[in-house]
């Protein structure tokens, strides 16, 4: 059960939180920032285990730690919404946080996708952050802390989940999937994101997209624009997954040609976000990706 937590358990981010609690300098509210799959929820679970652990160290062995990790501890509360977090949602959290913890010294309140909270909901929470209950700790998980109100950010301690090294992700994948031959390659293609590494192992479709990204980059000098366009069109409905994989592969290569092609991919992402016709955007990417002409970036 605990193999999945080892990477984040030994991370600098968790160590900083652990040390702050041991030294009596814990914050009453944290913003844990990072892309999907970066380990935000795992960090919040481990921090919760640390807070309720009867050994005060996130031993992962005592009943309190186990219940916190399983999401069944009465003093650890996870708030998640498929839609934007509303004032009503936030008021429910605030009312719960006003109650005394059942067993632990603190109640822990984890808000997933906090960046989706409406301005009204954030202002509702702000009053609690300004005068926090002494026995409550809040953890706001967000893709980008900049999407939260400045007044909310100023009352929280920011923890950034940055990328892990390929080697650390490889070891984590090996622990999770003993004997799996794809662990090394998945770690290299994960781009520092453990969630993506896991998805590459578990989801055949994503692995095939990663293989397509590898082929496009490896054969870019010999492919014709028509061949590259055909390859891209075959994945036209999954560009939101393929283009980041292409970017990671080009960054990993790091040579002059790859970095130039990275610019073309970034331009394609921008064009798609601006609702340019997808077929035109992909055909343009295929042409400049294989020809290496910089004019497209100036259009």
What are these regions (language model features)?
Residues 1-120:
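Clamp-loader machinery-focused feature within the broader ASCE/P-loop NTPase space
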Residues 112-118, 123-126, 130, 146:
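Catalytic acidic motif of RecA-like/P-loop NTPases
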Residues 98, 123-140:
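Conserved catalytic/switch belt of AAA+ P-loop NTPases
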Residues 1-49, 64-67, 134-137, 143-299:
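Charged, glycine-rich active-site and insertion segments that engage polyanionic ligands
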Residues 95, 127, 150, 154:
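Conserved adenine-binding aromatic site and its adjacent loop/helix in ATP-hydrolyzing domains
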